[in-house]
């Protein structure tokens, strides 16, 4: 049968197939490296380089198996024996319908299934060409069932693996020993699955015919050798790297503390102890010397230590006060009157606030007379003023106001303090402390220690803490860093083997029909066509892949190296097994199922359920939408173009 008159259809098919492969790379490739980019173990550029290598390799070695299902398993091609040109037009229509919808979805950042697209598009053109009789419905039912089985199976496997990792590694006080012991097992499992997949599916391509037991033995042997290599070389290197990083962090922290301790307290009048203050604990910095108790008596502490509350918090700072004749009440330097006459504060020398404030006082001394609104610029001086209080208007012993003026005096002091707090600057704050110091030297201020407060309640467990997402420690991050890269490459390899058929399956059918002049397509899938599809997928990844990577790697749920490893390994294992038995499962479904399962286990609130709902709806919308586009193109070809060719 002369097929030269349909050469234009083959050329058009090659162009559309590349566009389809481009759309597959722009959308579905996020399933492979989206979690790796989201967890930060690889950059987007590194992900594109690795994916280009493994997507192409997987498409060549594993793509032929699934390509046969796409070409022959969805429709009965024997019904087109007498109308070969109709089947060729149908393959072109299927590619157009699938490509258009995937490009639209990629633009909208919707992660959809390329398998859904091509299956729906194939059914769409068949319904237009010969009606429902051309569709093998039982095969379609199996495919639809796999769409639900794959996310559930992948999610279950990811969940179980993550629970085990969390139980034996992440929850340990020191996760490094168990993590290093598990590394050879993790690497061996990943390598074994990968080698078995290549040998089982790719052996015919390489001209090898091996029994199942031989393939299993080879896979086990390679995995064992790789595990031995990891145990002898990778684990010691990883242990040294983790130890070195921890030691470096400790050294930097120690050096920072030592440099801060060299700053003399005299440079910080804010923390200058007033005359008459009792000796104080090293961990508590008094703003002033004392506070008056309600009875007007002084309380001193033996040994020069402040009372301390449980759980490491100081009960109070010493605080200077001036007596007021208002019914046994006093007001502190911050001008805040309390019923019991006491104001309690806490400032620790080892706190970051104290150290940062010392730096700011030393390096950023403002000019006198130029106060600034520190509250507006979030300076540490303002924060400390809010914590420690501002010295108010102290009164001398001889300047006792009349009883009717007492309340006004307290109110004026409070207003003055608030006004100073609002427009506080370093100079005004320190001047107020200096004024109080002069008053103390002249005997105008009584210096007393604040009596202890009632013991605070022990910290309660916040139920919301259980809902917070877990984060990997630096050691765990290093342990799973390379593992996630390896499993991401493994997932990319599996993705190339499974999803290249979505782009190249119709093109292979079109090429074989043109070459053989028959619809049976007896020849094997040409390797160069699989490579052509892999190149198209990589191009789509580089140009447009980052759009859906954002959705899969960050928007759906936060990813860490440990959770990303479990997601990659379990979902890739599911995809490879499905590819080896010829079942075109959706890598999107497998990855989304794993991401949601692990995210839900890590934290009930970590999953964006609204986004997951949209993705789930898109799974059902994709088939009819792609079928509708394909049916429209098919109707145009068989009724508007082919009759005139």
Swiss-Prot record:
Residue intervals on the Cytoplasmic side: 27-46, 108-109, 164-190, 235-475, 545-564, 603-614
One term of GO molecular function: phosphate transmembrane transporter activity
Catalytic activity: 2 Na(+)(out) + phosphate(out) = 2 Na(+)(in) + phosphate(in)
Topological domain spans for side Extracellular: 1-5, 68-86, 131-142, 212-213, 497-523, 580-586, 636-645
Transmembrane portions of the chain: 6-26, 47-67, 87-107, 110-130, 143-163, 191-211, 214-234, 476-496, 524-544, 565-579, 587-602, 615-635
Keywords from the named record: Cell membrane, Glycoprotein, Host-virus interaction, Ion transport, Membrane, Phosphate transport, Phosphoprotein, Receptor, Sodium, Sodium transport, Symport, Transmembrane, Transmembrane helix, Transport
Taxonomic superkingdom: Eukaryota
GO CC list: apical plasma membrane; brush border membrane; plasma membrane
Membrane topology: Multi-pass membrane protein
GO biological process assignments: phosphate ion transmembrane transport; positive regulation of bone mineralization
Pfam families reported for this sequence: PHO4
Cellular compartments annotated: Cell membrane; Apical cell membrane
InterPro entries per UniProt: Phos_transporter (IPR001204)
Region described as Disordered: 275-320, 448-471
Positions glycosylated per UniProt: 81
Subunit-level organization: Homodimer.
Functional note: Sodium-phosphate symporter which preferentially transports the monovalent form of phosphate with a stoichiometry of two sodium ions per phosphate ion. Plays a critical role in the determination of bone quality and strength by providing phosphate for bone mineralization. Required to maintain normal cerebrospinal fluid phosphate levels. Mediates phosphate-induced calcification of vascular smooth muscle cells (VCMCs) and can functionally compensate for loss of SLC20A1 in VCMCs.
Family stated for the protein in its record: Belongs to the inorganic phosphate transporter (PiT) (TC 2.A.20) family.
Name of the featured protein: Sodium-dependent phosphate transporter 2
Organism: Bos taurus (Bovine)
């Amino acid at each position: 049968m002369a097929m030269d008159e349909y050469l234009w259809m083959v050329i058009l098919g090659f162009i559309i197939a590349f566009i389809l492969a481009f759309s597959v790379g722009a959308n579905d490739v996020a399933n492979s490296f989206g979690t790796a980019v989201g967890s930060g173990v690889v950059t987007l550029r590194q992900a594109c380089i690795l994916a280009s290598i493994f997507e192409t390799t997987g498409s060549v070695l594993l793509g032929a198996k699934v390509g046969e299902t796409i070409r022959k398993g969805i429709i009965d091609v024997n019904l087109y024996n007498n109308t070969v040109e109709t089947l060729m037009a149908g393959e072109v229509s299927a590619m157009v319908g699938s490509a258009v919808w995937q490009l639209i979805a990629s633009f909208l950042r919707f992660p959809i299934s390329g398998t859904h697209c091509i299956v729906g598009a194939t059914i769409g053109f068949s319904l237009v060409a010969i009606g429902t009789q051309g569709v093998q419905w039982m095969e379609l039912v199996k495919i639809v069932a796999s769409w639900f089985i794959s996310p559930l199976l992948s999610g279950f496997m990811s969940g179980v693996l993550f629970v085990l990792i969390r139980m034996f590694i992440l929850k340990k006080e020191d996760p490094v020993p168990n993590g290093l012991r598990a590394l050879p097992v993790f690497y061996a499992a990943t390598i074994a699955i990968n080698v078995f997949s290549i040998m089982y599916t790719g052996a015919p391509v390489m001209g090898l015919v091996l029994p199942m037991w031989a393939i299993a033995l080879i896979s086990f042997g390679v995995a064992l050798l790789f595990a031995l290599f990891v145990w002898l070389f990778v684990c010691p290197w990883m242990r040294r790297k983790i130890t070195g990083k921890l030691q470096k962090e400790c050294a930097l922290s120690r050096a920072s503390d030592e440099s801060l301790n060299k700053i003399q307290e005299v440079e910080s009048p804010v923390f200058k102890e007033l005359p008459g203050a009792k000796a104080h604990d090293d961990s508590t910095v008094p703003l002033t010397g004392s506070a008056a108790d309600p009875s007007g008596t002084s309380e001193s502490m033996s040994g020069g230590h402040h009372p301390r509350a449980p759980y490491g918090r100081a009960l109070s700072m010493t605080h200077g006060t001036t007596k007021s004749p208002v019914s046994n009440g006093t007001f502190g330097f911050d001008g805040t009157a309390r019923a019991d006459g006491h104001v309690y504060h806490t400032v620790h020398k080892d706190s970051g606030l104290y150290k940062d404030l010392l730096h700011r006082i030393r390096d950023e001394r403002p000019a006198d007379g130029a106060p600034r609104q520190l509250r507006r610029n979030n300076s540490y001086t303002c924060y400390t003023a809010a914590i420690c209080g501002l010295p108010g208007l102290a009164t001398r012993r001889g300047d006792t106001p009349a009883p009717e003026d007492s309340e006004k005096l307290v109110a004026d002091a409070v207003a003055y303090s608030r006004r100073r707090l609002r427009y506080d600057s370093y100079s005004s704050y320190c001047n107020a402390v200096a004024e109080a110091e002069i008053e103390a030297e002249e005997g105008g201020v009584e210096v007393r220690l604040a009596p202890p407060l009632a013991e605070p309640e022990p910290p309660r467990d916040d139920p919301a803490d259980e809902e917070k997402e877990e984060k990997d420690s630096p050691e765990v991050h290093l342990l799973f860093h390379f593992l996630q890269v390896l499993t991401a490459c493994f997932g990319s390899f599996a993705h190339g083997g499974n999803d290249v058929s979505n782009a190249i399956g119709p093109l292979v059918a079109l090429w074989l029909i043109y070459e053989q002049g028959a619809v049976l397509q007896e020849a094997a899938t040409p390797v160069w066509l699989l490579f052509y599809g892999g190149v198209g997928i990589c191009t789509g990844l580089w140009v447009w892949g980052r759009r859906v990577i954002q959705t899969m790697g960050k928007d759906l749920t936060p990813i860490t190296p440990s959770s990303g490893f479990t997601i990659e390994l379990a979902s890739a294992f599911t995809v490879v097994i499905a590819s080896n038995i010829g079942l075109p499962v959706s890598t999107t479904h497998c990855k989304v199922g794993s991401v949601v399962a692990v995210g839900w286990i890590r934290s009930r609130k970590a999953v964006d359920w609204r986004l997951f709902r949209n993705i789930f709806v898109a799974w059902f919308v994709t088939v009819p939408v792609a079928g509708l586009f394909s049916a429209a193109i098919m109707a145009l070809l068989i009724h508007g173009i082919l009759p005139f060719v």
